[in-house]
Amino acid sequence: MNPNYLDFEQPIADLEAKIQDLRTASAGPSVNVDIEVRALENKLRLRTAQIFRNLSAWQISQLARHPRRPYTLDYISIVCDEFQELAGDRTLADDKAIVGGLARIGHRPVMLIGHQKGRDNKERLMRNFGMPKPEGYRKALRLMKLAERFGLPLLTFIDTMGAWPGIDAEERNQSEAIATNLIEMAELKIPVICTVIGEGGSGGALAIGIGDRTLMLEYSTYSVITPEGCASILWKDAAKASDAAEQLNLTARRLKEFGLIDKVIREPIGGAHRNPQQMANRLKAVLLNELEALDKVPLVTLLNQRHKRLRTYGAYENH
């Protein structure tokens, strides 16, 4: 199977292959297959819409990790009119799993920070598979404080399985780095908008995920643990990941129903990877609207609302 297609996308892959075969055959001067191609293209649109109308939580989890899904730098290249990356935590190193810098979106100057995965094996290793170490979170914090100093709104793009769990990260106090970011983000005296663009995994996501607005792309996920990790703990069997995904309620739709996020940003039919330009344009429009709305909120009110939001996390009622 083509690695760019997930298992449940196989009918889509088959139709696209047929369309490509017909187009190749029509290269000859005496062959006209326009009618057949249009019919297959219409069938492809209908089949894609049908498949994506009834996705399970596990299928959405797979989409959130799709190898062609746009990453932070992909969105930056389209959403931002200007971007100047800033590197290093000024203590140890520059963690490539976190990217960030000064940006301009339309007329709006902002600070933008996000997780960054890799497209090929070389880049995945360089980016540590999008799993930051303490120096990554300390770099992020440095940029957050810089944004606060200059009164720039902060935008974060979340896309990680979680913080790096290696011994080297623990030796450099991973938990402290995450905890410090949570504390500092809660008190930042600037508007903060957090957007889950792919995977939102545990504390590794939360460390750049505390803000005044939390947005999620339609086929992104946000959870305390991966479905595989949850299945391994609860059932001692990672093969039960699909069951775990349902129990974790990790989809954007479910989290919106629970009141844990503010907005679900609709993706193109078939997912963000099928039309990154369209997805980025939608994201840009939403971010500009949210920034405009937050401009009207006094700073004291903004902080009070942020604190109230944090205190409601985990609260529930028995009925």
Curated annotation (Swiss-Prot):
Keywords of this entry: ATP-binding, Cytoplasm, Fatty acid biosynthesis, Fatty acid metabolism, Lipid biosynthesis, Lipid metabolism, Nucleotide-binding, Transferase
Pfam families: ACCA
GO biological process, alphabetically ordered: fatty acid biosynthetic process; malonyl-CoA biosynthetic process
Entry GO terms, CC: acetyl-CoA carboxylase complex
Catalytic activity: N(6)-carboxybiotinyl-L-lysyl-[protein] + acetyl-CoA = N(6)-biotinyl-L-lysyl-[protein] + malonyl-CoA
Subcellular location field: Cytoplasm
Chief place of localization: cytoplasm
Catalytic EC class: transferase
Pathway in which the depicted protein is active: Lipid metabolism; malonyl-CoA biosynthesis; malonyl-CoA from acetyl-CoA: step 1/1
Domain CoA carboxyltransferase C-terminal: 32-293
GO MF term (any one): ATP binding
Enzyme Commission number(s) of this protein: 2.1.3.15
NCBIfam families in the cross-refs: accA, AccA_sub, PRK05724.1
Role this protein plays: Component of the acetyl coenzyme A carboxylase (ACC) complex. First, biotin carboxylase catalyzes the carboxylation of biotin on its carrier protein (BCCP) and then the CO(2) group is transferred by the carboxyltransferase to acetyl-CoA to form malonyl-CoA.
Similarity remark: Belongs to the AccA family.
PANTHER family the record matches: ACETYL-COENZYME A CARBOXYLASE CARBOXYL TRANSFERASE SUBUNIT ALPHA, ACETYL-COENZYME A CARBOXYLASE CARBOXYL TRANSFERASE SUBUNIT ALPHA, CHLOROPLASTIC
Name this polypeptide is given: Acetyl-coenzyme A carboxylase carboxyl transferase subunit alpha
Species of the source: Xylella fastidiosa (strain Temecula1 / ATCC 700964)
Record lineage: Bacteria, Pseudomonadati, Pseudomonadota, Gammaproteobacteria, Lysobacterales
Gene name of this polypeptide: accA
